Amino acid sequence: MKTQRLLLFLILLPLQLCAAVAPENLAVGDWVFRAGTGRESALIRYLDGGEYSHIGIVVAVAPEIRIVHATTDDDPARPNQVIASSFSEFSAPPLAGKIAAARPVFLNESERAQLAAAVARHLGEPFHLTAREQSPRYCTTIIYDALIALRPATSARWRHIDLPLLEGDYLFPQALAELPQLEWLP
């Protein structure tokens, strides 16, 4: 009877209340994707048709996993900027409906570390959700810009948006998720 009640409780427990668990083999340079829970996240997923609305890069795994990402409101003390968050902060249920991690295996370990360091150099810089032609700085572009500095031939799909206040070409997390030679971590 106790087992049945426990199973019923687990089935009825909203998944958003369960904290995400980091993959055991997460390494510096891996990408962490998040399906956010807010309206902006829903809009991003709608506009792009992708599963995820946010992305960050692992810059440290010890003593704790640290993820650098550009965000508007993850941390009220540091709004609209590039920040470093712990994995538990990045994947907290109020912010994350779903989390996934991927390793860009088209880069070797040293290049992934260089990529992470290049993104981390943007810490504290302001968040700019602007079109491609206007020097954007948001979650996807800080990783992509560092990536093309390492591998200039890399090309990701920019999506043209034609909405009031959002007109031009934008790079969504799904574009990085579609790059060849990504290894999705269990």
Where are these regions (language model features)?
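Bacterial N-terminal signal peptides that target proteins for export
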Residues: 1-7
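Bacterial N-terminal signal peptides
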Residues: 7-16
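Boundary at the C-terminal end of the N-terminal hydrophobic targeting segment
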Residues: 17-23
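Loop/turn positions that initiate beta-strands
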Residues: 28-30
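Glycine-rich catalytic cores of cysteine/serine-nucleophile enzymes that process amide/ester linkages
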Residues: 34-100, 125-137
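Sec-exported extracytoplasmic/periplasmic mature domains
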Residues: 60, 120, 124-127, 147-152
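Stable alpha-helical elements in mature extracytoplasmic
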Residues: 111-119, 135, 139-142
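Activation targets extended, charge/polar-rich intrinsically disordered C-terminal tails
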Residues: 130-186
